[in-house]
Amino acid sequence: MESFIIEGGHMLSGTITPQGAKNEALEVICATLLTNEEVRIKNIPDILDVNNLILLLKDIGVEVNRVGKNEYTFCSKNIDLGYLDGEEFVRKCASLRGSVLMIGPLLARFGKAVVAKPGGDKIGRRRLDTHFLGFKKLGAKFVHSEGTNTFEIKANRLKGTYMLLDEASVTGTANIIMAA
C-alpha cells in the first residue's frame, strides 16, 4: 500500500485555475441555443468532445468566436434547421454523445430537433431513455426513421409537468430543464 507523508509548517501561496469540467461545459454550451443573444463562456476545457460540439454548433449556424484562452462567445441568431436533416449532421451526432444535449434547447426554441443514436465514450449503462421520457412528458412527439436511424422530435408547445425520472441522470435533468 502506498502512502503520502505530509509535513506541516510550510506556507503555501499562489493560485491555480482548474480546468472546466467536460459535462458541465457541454450543457452550458448547448444552453446558448436557447437565445439569439451573444453569450460569453469562460473556462471551457480544450478537449475533444467539447471542441467537436463547438464545431457542430458552428455547422448549424451558431456564430462562435474564441476571445481568449478557454473563453468563447456564442450567438445562435441564425440557426439552420434544415442542416439537422442532413447526413453530415447525423454522422457527427452519432460520434458525439454530447450532441443529445442539443435536443432540449432546440425543442424549446424551435419546436424541432433531430438526433442520431449518439456514440462517444462508453462508460457503464448510458441510456437516453431518461431524456426521451422527459421530453414526452413535456409534450414532444418522436418519429423514428429506420433508414437513417434517427429520431425527429417535434413539439408545437411544450408544457411543464411534475416528473419523477426513472433513473438519476444529470445530463437528462439538464436537457429536460432546458426544454421546459
Q: What are the functions of these language-model segments?
A:
Residues M1-A180:
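Structural preference for solvent-exposed beta-strand-turn elements
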